[in-house]
Amino acid sequence: MLMSQITIILPDNSTKVFDHEPTALEVAMSIGPRLAKETLGAKLNGSTEISDLRTVLKDQTKVALVTTKSPESVEVVRHSCAHIMAQAIQDIWPEVKVTIGPVIDNGFYYDFDSPFAFTEEHFEKIEKKMSEIVSKDLPIHREDWPIQKAIETFKGMNERFKVELIEDLAKKGETTVGIYFNGTSWFDLCRGPHIQSTGQIKAFKLLSVAGAYWRGDEKNAQLQRVYATAFNDKKDLETYLHNIEEAKKRDHRKLGKELGMFYFNELAPGSPFFTGKGATVYNSLQTYLRELYFETGYQEVITPQIFDVNLFHTSGHYQNYKENMFFTKVDERDFASKPMNCPSHCLLYNSEKYSYRDLPIKMADFGRLHRYEKSGAMHGLTRVRTFCQDDAHIFCRMDQLQEEIAKFMNLLNRVYDKLGMGNYKIFLSTRPDNRMGSEEYWDMAEGALAEALKSLNLPFELNPGDGAFYGPKLDIMFVDALNRPWQLGTLQVDPNLPQAFDLKYTGEDNKEHRPVMLHRAILGSLERFIGVYLEHTAGHLPPWMMPVQVAILNVTDRVNSFCEELQNSLKGHSVRVEFDRRNEKLNYKIREAQLQKIPYMIIVGDKEAESRTVSLRLRDGSEHKGLTVDQVMNLITTDIKTRSLQSSLAKSATTN
C-alpha cells in the first residue's frame, strides 16, 4: 500500500512534497545540497526549541531550518562539541567515566568522574585529540535503544552515572532512549540535537576546570567539571576569548578593591560592606531615582524588615518561596525577614481608604531585603544575601493599566539613556508551572502586558514559563559592553496579591472594586546593578557618580595657596574634590588619579597660579590648557548637575 503524499510547509509558506515521511535533513537536501551542508537543526511548528535533523516529520509540519548563519545554531554546535570533548578524554584516559554535558550560556561543560585531578595543563592534550576527531569528519548518527539494552550496555562499560539516568527514565515510563554515535565506536546517552558530522565543528576552546557534585548534591560523588566553548567560526571564538580577558580586567570584585568601594567579610557572608567611596556611588544612584520619583508621582515609603510569618502565608511567599527566606522565633512567634517589599506595601495600602479618583497609588521603597543564596552561588555584588532594590508598586484601575505601563517604560528609558545603557531587549515572561491564581487571572495579566507593549510599538520576545509565581512579567535584558546579557529592570502584573490582601477602592459607581497591582524596578538590586555597571564601564563611572570627581595636582608647593582656593570653591559647589599635595612627580600623581578613574584633574604650576588659569586633564588622556577658573567651574559643575555621562570637553573632542 502506497503512503499518501507528505507535505512540509516552509517559513515562506511554500511547500515540499515527499512520498514518505522525510527527516528535517531530507527537507534541507530537497532545497539544495549547499543548504543541507550548512543546516544544523530545525524548528518545528513555530517552536523555539531546535529539533534534530534526523527527526522524522509528519504531514503538514511547519519547518524552519537552522543553519550556521542562525545565531541559535551555535547551541547545536556546542552540544556536539561536548560529546567530542568527552570522546577525546575517554580516548586518552579510558578510566575516566562520563556523566552529563549540557550547553550553557556562552559554552558548555561536561562533568567527569576521574581518578586524577584535571588541570589546565591537560587542556592542550585534550584539544589536540579533539582536533583529530574533528579532522576525521566522523558521521554522527542516532539510534533509539530499548531501555533494558541501554542499561545493560552502560553497565557493561561501568558507566554507573549513565545507568542511573536511564533507570530514572524507565521509572518515568520511557521505553526507549536516544543514543548518539560519533563514528562507530564512541556513543553517549542523549536527546539531541546534534550536527551531521564532527567536521562541522569549526572553532572550540577549553576554558577552565572546577569541582562539582553529581546532580548538584554535596552528598553525592564529587566530579570534575571541564568548561569549554565552541563557535561557528574562528573569528567569533577570538572575539569571545578577547572578551573573557577583558572581563577579567573589568571584574567588579577587582575594580571594587582597586577603587576602594566595597569589601566582604566571612562573618557576614553575602553581605557587602560599602566604604565611604562605595556609599557615595550607592547614594548617588538613590538620589537620582528619588528625584525622578518625586517628578513622576511616586511616594517613598519605609516599611519594616521583619514580619510575623502569617504575612507571608497570606502573600503566598511562604508556600512558594520559603527556601529563599530567613526565619527566626521571638517570644514564641515565628518571624521572617522580608525577601520582597510587596506584602508590606499591601498592608500599607489597606491602612487607608481610596476612591477611583485617588488611583494610581505609587509606593517606592528602598528597604533592605534578605534572600538566602547557597554559599557556592554567591558572587561579589551580583549574587548576595542582603540588598536594596529600586522597588516600587503601583496600585491602579484596570483602565489605567496601559497608561501606567507606558509611563514606566518612559521612565526606564530615561534612566537607561542617562546611564548610557541603550542596548536592551524586552522579554514577556509567561506563566510558570509552579504558580498561584486562576487561569483567568493569568490570561488577563499576560494579555494586558502584551497589548500595552504593542500599543507602544515596543518590540518584545516571549519567554514562556519564566514568569513569577504570582504573575507574568516584563524582563528588561541589558546587554553590556562585552555583549553579556543582564536582567535588570522588570514590570510584573499581579492580580493575586490584591485578592489575597482584599485590596479595594471605591469606584465611580460607589461599589468596591479590586485594584490592579504592578511590581516594578528599573535597576533591580542596587548592589547587583553597581557590580554590572562597574564592569560595563570598566570603572569609568559618570562624573556625577564618582566618589572623587576632581583631583587637584600641584607641580610645586609654591602654588598650594591657589590650589586650596580652587578646592574650597569646588567644595562650595558640592563637588567632591581632593587636593594631592604629596611631594611626588606630576606624572606619578596623574597616573594615580587615572588609576582611581577620577574624571577631572586640575593641574597647577607657577605659570597657572600667576595667571589664575589651570590645565584641565580628563581621564581619557586629553588635556585642555589655559582655562580660567570660571570656565573650569562652569564646565565641571554643569557636567555634574546635568548628570552627563562624561565631560562635555570629551564629547566635543570625540565629535570633532
Swiss-Prot record:
Keywords: Aminoacyl-tRNA synthetase, ATP-binding, Cytoplasm, Ligase, Metal-binding, Nucleotide-binding, Protein biosynthesis, RNA-binding, tRNA-binding, Zinc. Pfam families: HGTP_anticodon, TGS, tRNA-synt_2b, tRNA_SAD. InterPro entries: aa-tRNA-synt_IIb, aa-tRNA-synth_II, aa-tRNA-synth_II/BPL/LPL, Anticodon-bd, Anticodon-bd_dom_sf, Beta-grasp_dom_sf, TGS, TGS-like. It is found in: Cytoplasm. SMART domains: tRNA_SAD (SM00863). CDD domains: TGS_ThrRS, ThrRS_anticodon, ThrRS_core. GO terms for cellular component: cytoplasm. It catalyses: tRNA(Thr) + L-threonine + ATP = L-threonyl-tRNA(Thr) + AMP + diphosphate + H(+). Its EC number is 6.1.1.3. Belongs to the class-II aminoacyl-tRNA synthetase family. This is Threonine--tRNA ligase. It comes from Bdellovibrio bacteriovorus (strain ATCC 15356 / DSM 50701 / NCIMB 9529 / HD100).
